[in-house]
A protein has these predicted regions:
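Conserved hydrophobic/aromatic beta-strand scaffold that supports enzyme active sites
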Residues: 18-21, 92, 215, 321-323, ...
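Membrane-embedded alpha-helical bundles of multi-pass enzymes
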Residues: 1-204, 398, 411, 428-434, ...
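Short, solvent-exposed cationic patches
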Residues: 348-365, 392, 453-474
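Soluble catalytic regions of membrane-associated enzymes that act on cell-envelope
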Residues: 197-345, 358
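A general structural motif
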Residues: 219-220, 251-256, 345-351, 369-375, ...
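Generic structural signal for well-ordered alpha-helices
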Residues: 90, 94, 256-260, 355, ...
Length: 488
């Protein structure tokens, strides 16, 4: 391969791969992007091609991830370097192992390697599953159903396998007599996946219990820019304490009043986003009494995203959800266990890692908070517990609002759980157990309340039972395949 062809393939591949991580990603981008990158790395010596590939991918990822990773610049570029290394690793394995044999069965090495390194990154890196290319397939409901069986790993495998087969066919000059078997094999597997996914959606429950729920978001006009951040950090001194307490009182009153409005409109469950109700530690008992009174008088379940501030502590913020039933009882209180790296991690007390699930009149209700849901194995606690409804308080920012919303759909499918997503600075929404959107509202549109009639009831999924077994099988397959090819 000439240098011009190499650079063209590399740049096209890097562009398509890069936009796979954006909320508005074109779904076919990773399928073709990985194929172009494979073609580039296969057509030039590893010592020349792989370092250039790593550099170009680093630039692409640094550009598209801007605004997504909430860390200062020095750490941002270090994290991008780590993400780039994980992205390049499967190409290294493919170039060094798969090229030892010209048979089409070697097309499996690249997808096995991609799943292996993606799996390791999800389990070990602080960002969880954020770098998964499977999320680019949001909206393709039949394909998304594969997550109920394999988690997102099955979707990732198919994307990478398509790229590997396409590149192999490219190398064979697309001679049909040569590429027929792998092409038909892939088409057959994909057809089965899509048909099975379609059947799963068609057979989805259309009748059954549902609940009218409302997500009440942060009100505008109370705090000055940066003031909420300062309160969450516990930076309150005697000179402005009275002013801060008055604003917090207005905030509390706003949430309670709007909760009453939604309950009188028919809502049986009202949820508030992550840390939207900031409250000083000493004022929390009094506020909770007011919240219990509202829940009892309106006969509702109230799930509150609280940010309890301990002024003077090294880590002043308790980021938690407290749920009160219509009898005024606190049925669970859960603290977030996965703080977002950077600012939140520096100020937040970390929870114990046990997700709550309680029996209610609505069924078994569970919860997690925002970034917790980006760790599939962690959230599987709710799937194993046969949770009928998950309440997920979230606090996003503009750059990630749709991307993070889309990721929630995969958690619903994996665990067979309907999800109420109450978001501030993002998209509130509700999903059924098959990942279908029941309702959504963009906080940036100026709408502070989302209302949805959410189907309730868990659906048993294979993934909730076996977890990441498919990913582990890919790890084993990569090791076994590499040994066989090296010995051969």
């Amino acid at each position: 391969m000439g240098q011009i062809t190499f650079l063209i393939s590399l740049l096209i591949g890097a562009f398509l791969f890069g936009i796979s991580f954006r909320a508005n990603a074109i779904s076919f981008a990773p399928w073709l992007g990985l194929a172009f990158l494979l073609h580039a790395t296969r057509g030039i010596s590893p010592s020349r091609g792989l370092p250039v590939t790593a550099f170009v991918l680093y630039i692409a990822l640094a550009f598209v991830q801007r605004g997504i990773l909430p860390v200062p610049d020095p750490l941002y570029f270090i994290m991008i370097a780590g993400i780039t290394l994980v992205a390049v690793a499967p190409f290294v394995v493919d170039r060094l192992i798969a090229t030892r044999n010209s048979g089409w069965i070697t097309t499996l090495i690249f997808p096995l390697a991609w799943v292996t390194f993606d799996f390791a990154q999800t389990r070990l890196a602080p960002g969880g599953s954020w770098e998964s290319i499977a999320y680019s397939q949001y909206g393709n409901l039949p394909l998304m159903q594969l997550a109920a069986f394999t988690g997102t790993w099955g979707i990732t495998f198919l994307i990478a396998w398509f790229a590997s087969i396409l590149n192999w066919g490219w190398e064979q000059k697309f001679l049909w007599s040569t590429i027929r078997v792998p092409a038909l094999t892939f088409v057959g597997v994909c057809s089965l996946v899509l048909i099975a996914g379609g059947i799963r959606i068609v057979r989805a429950h259309k009748d059954g219990q549902s609940v009218r729920a409302a997500a009440v978001s942060f009100p505008a006009g109370i705090f000055q820019p940066g003031e909420r951040t300062r309160i969450a950090e516990g930076r309150i001194d005697a000179t402005d304490r009275a002013v801060i307490e008055e604003k917090l009182s207005r905030l509390h009153q706003s949430f309670l009043e709007r909760t009453r409005v939604e309950s009188r409109g028919g809502a049986k469950l009202v949820a508030w986003p992550e840390t939207n109700l900031l409250v000083l530690q000493e004022d929390e008992p009094s506020f909770l009494e007011h919240a219990r009174k509202v829940a009892v008088e309106e006969r509702i379940y109230l799930a509150m995203g609280l940010g309890t501030v301990h002024v003077g502590n090294a880590k002043p913020l308790e980021n938690k959800i407290v749920m009160i039933d219509p009898a005024g009882q606190t049925i669970f209180s859960y603290e977030k266990s996965h703080p977002v790296p950077g600012w939140e991690e520096s100020i937040m007390v970390t929870g114990d890692g046990r997700l709550p699930v309680v029996a209610t009149d609505l069924g078994r209700v569970g919860s997690a908070i925002c970034f917790d849901a980006d760790f599939p194995e962690y959230l599987r606690q709710l799937g194993r517990a046969r949770t009928d409804l998950m309440v997920l308080p979230v606090n996003d920012w503009a750059a990630i609002k749709y991307q993070h919303f889309a990721m929630t759909a995969f958690r619903a499918i994996e665990n067979g759980i309907p999800i109420l997503r109450a978001a501030s600075s993002g998209v509130s929404g509700a999903f059924d157990a098959w990942g279908r959107v029941v309702a959504l509202t963009d906080h940036f549109s100026g709408t502070e309340v989302m209302v949805a009639e959410i189907p309730i009831g868990s659906v048993t999924t294979l993934y909730s039972v076996i977890g990441d077994l498919f990913a582990w099988l890919c790890v084993a397959g990569l090791i076994a395949g590499s040994v066989v090819l090296m010995l051969a």
